[in-house]
Amino acid sequence: MAYERFTSAITLLLHWRNRLDPYWKLARGDRPVGFLLLLWPTWWALWLAADGVPPWWTLCVFTTGIWLTRSAGCVINDYTDRWLDPHVERTCTRPLVTGTVSPRNALLMFGTLMLIAFGLVLTMNRLTVLLSVAGLFLAMTYPYLKRYTHLPQVYLGIAFGWGIPMAFAAIQGKVPTLAWLLYVANILWTTAYDTWYAMVDRDDDIKMGAKSTAILFADLDLVVQGVLYTLMLLTLCLVGLRATLSHTYWISLISAVALIGYQFIIARRREPTACFRAFMHNNWVGMTIFAGIALATTH
């Protein structure tokens, strides 16, 4: 009897795992790099706003909120890209394409994730709550941009970085110039690294009529990315000067330069797999800059 109960429990667990696995993949739970690329800039902001380790509840709210909103963003992105994903090699096995998740359930999942995230934000101050409404608008409208403009990567940077002004608002009750400088740096960074991502799908996107910075920049893609990364680093220099950060921050920026240079080495021939590696490598850039900020604000 005990053995039968054990096997029944295992069978039930496997059943639910198989049922929930497509939803986990739809939310990109199996690909944490996207979450980390959102997390690092938000943590930059939290540590700078608090001039050190932020309040534990604020840190928990923003960290959990980042995971929830990133997952929701992936869900709504796949929902709006149903016309495109079946024709792109990298995305043709996504749950909404294969039918393992229905469009209706995807919308329900998006709404649930955003409601939970909003519930967390309601524990913050009024300014943070108001800013979160703008963040919701950005998250919902981003997926449609690739149909109408070659600059969805720029808009992604605007959406991805919205946690920065929210973090300052939550801790300081205002959004100072320092926050907007950091926000601009993140827009430049996101545009640059998401162009690597767009270069992976460039040929398929051209066939389907989708738009991206990779298509817009064409043969000048590496040059423009170099300019974007340079502007990002210069803006981060302004952040360091305005916040009067110590030498550890500047060491982290020098390290970031080396890491970014490595991306151009591995993706210099524009091969899709190499471009994807360059995109993934930006996690180390974000983490390095965070380490510099965290050490520089330690008292």
UniProtKB/Swiss-Prot annotation:
Membrane topology qualifier: Multi-pass membrane protein
Pathway of action: Cofactor biosynthesis; ubiquinone biosynthesis
Enzyme Commission number(s) of this protein: 2.5.1.39
Example of a GO MF term: 4-hydroxybenzoate polyprenyltransferase activity
Keywords, ordered alphabetically: Cell inner membrane, Cell membrane, Magnesium, Membrane, Transferase, Transmembrane, Transmembrane helix, Ubiquinone biosynthesis
TM spans (from-to): 33-53, 56-76, 105-125, 151-171, 180-200, 214-234, 247-267, 278-298
A biological-process GO annotation: ubiquinone biosynthetic process
Pfam family, one: UbiA
Main localisation: membrane
Known cofactor(s): Mg(2+)
Broad EC category: transferase
GO cellular component, one term: plasma membrane
Xref: HAMAP family: UbiA
Job of this protein: Catalyzes the prenylation of para-hydroxybenzoate (PHB) with an all-trans polyprenyl group. Mediates the second step in the final reaction sequence of ubiquinone-8 (UQ-8) biosynthesis, which is the condensation of the polyisoprenoid side chain with PHB, generating the first membrane-bound Q intermediate 3-octaprenyl-4-hydroxybenzoate.
NCBIfam families xref list: ubiA_proteo (TIGR01474)
Family under the similarity heading: Belongs to the UbiA prenyltransferase family.
Name this protein carries in UniProt: 4-hydroxybenzoate octaprenyltransferase
Species whose genome carries this gene: Xylella fastidiosa (strain Temecula1 / ATCC 700964)
